[in-house]
């Protein structure tokens, strides 16, 4: 039985998958298995996997595309290791990741998972030091070291932790049923919040022991709606005992519903969009943006899209968009 199970879910990224798998094969700690779970890729992923003649590599190919979370779960359910990590097919581990994270879990029985800091890399596997430093500061990773004192705050308020740079005890993931399919698109956020609510203990290594790839380009409207629906599901499913934290949850939920309502109106789902905008405005109050979106929802789609595109030109770019521009 391997000590560590490394799960790499993949879909149509054969070119990046090679880099990801080789980063595991080159680890200084070698007691692992690699589980590549393929969500019915239509590229040459099966042929790429065949090049590795190593009994530690297991390949699970889904018969049909079932979505990210379901594909990830298939790898988790197949895992045999005491410890478990999942990272995406376009990311990578630095050579000492397993050695240093395994040492913490071996030496500290009360710790359920170990997170590390990570690099930002571009399409050519080049590290961007400025983007890495900014990312670390934005998400509060640069102030963490050792046992994480308030895991729920780090997971829910600051969103400091990332699944792809974390080694877990597999049994702690089993205790919370790992990833929920309904959270597809914001699995990291949801998993860490549920681990915190279950009383699990996290540990943070400030070294940069993983590489996270940022891609250029914009996210599509369909992708944005998918993410916002998943985030709304997650926020609706939590209930915090602490009064102030519960207030934050309700405020965040209202904000997500407003953002989702705006995008549904843009997508032509007018009735559902208006309903969410009205619901969120009860908590946030009506704004000029919401009022305008409600008016636009009664206009033909061609007019609606024209005005939306014009307004978008004046919207300041968010953090993710700025980073994508830098690393692309």
Could you describe each region identified by the protein language model?
Residues 62-79, 89:
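Glycine-rich, basic loop-to-helix element that forms the pyrophosphate-binding segment
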Residues 200, 207-216, 220-247, 266-284:
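Catalytic core of nucleotide-sugar-dependent glycosyltransferases
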Residues 2-5, 33, 190:
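Cell-envelope/extracellular polymer assembly enzymes that use nucleotide-activated donors
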Residues 139-226:
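Conserved nucleotide-sugar donor-binding catalytic segment
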Residues 1-25:
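N-proximal low-complexity "stem/linker" segments adjacent to membrane-targeting elements
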Residues 30, 38-47, 64, 88:
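A conserved acidic beta->alpha catalytic loop
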Residues 70-72, 99-104, 110-172:
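Flexible acidic/His/Gly-enriched loops in nucleotide-sugar-dependent glycosyltransferase catalytic domains
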Residues 84:
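Short aromatic/hydrophobic "clamp" motif used to bind/position activated sugar donors
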């Amino acid at each position: 039985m391997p000590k560590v199970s490394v799960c790499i879910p993949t879909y149509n990224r054969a070119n990046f998958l090679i880099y990801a798998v080789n980063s595991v094969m080159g680890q200084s700690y070698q007691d692992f298995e690699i589980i590549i779970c393929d969500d019915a890729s239509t590229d040459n992923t099966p042929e790429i996997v065949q090049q590795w003649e190593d009994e530690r590599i297991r390949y699970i190919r889904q018969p049909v595309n079932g979505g990210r979370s379901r594909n990830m779960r298939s790898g988790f359910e197949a895992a045999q290791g005491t410890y478990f990590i999942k990272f995406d097919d376009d990311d990578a581990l630095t050579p000492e990741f397993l050695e240093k994270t395994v040492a913490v879990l071996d030496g500290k029985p009360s710790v359920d998972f170990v997170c590390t800091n990570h690099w930002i890399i571009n399409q050519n596997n080049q590290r961007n030091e400025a983007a890495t430093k900014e990312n670390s500061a934005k998400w509060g990773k640069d102030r963490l070291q050792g046992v994480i004192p308030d895991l729920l705050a780090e997971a829910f308020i600051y969103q400091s932790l990332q699944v792809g740079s974390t080694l877990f005890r597999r049994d702690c993931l089993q205790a919370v049923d790992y990833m929920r399919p309904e959270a597809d698109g914001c699995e990291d956020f949801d998993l860490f919040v549920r681990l915190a609510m279950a009383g699990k203990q996290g540990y943070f290594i400030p070294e940069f022991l993983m590489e996270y790839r940022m891609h250029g380009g914009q996210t599509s409207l369909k992708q944005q709606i998918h993410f916002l629906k998943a985030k709304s599901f997650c926020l609706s499913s939590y209930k915090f005992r602490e009064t102030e934290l519960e207030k934050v949850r309700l405020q965040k939920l209202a904000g997500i519903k407003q953002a989702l309502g705006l995008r549904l109106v843009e997508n032509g789902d007018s009735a559902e969009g208006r309903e969410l905008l009205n619901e969120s405005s009860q908590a946030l109050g009506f704004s000029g943006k919401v009022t305008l979106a409600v008016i636009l929802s009664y206009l033909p789609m061609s007019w609606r899209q024209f005005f939306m595109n014009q307004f978008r030109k004046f919207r300041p770019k968010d953090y993710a968009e700025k980073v994508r521009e830098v690393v692309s």
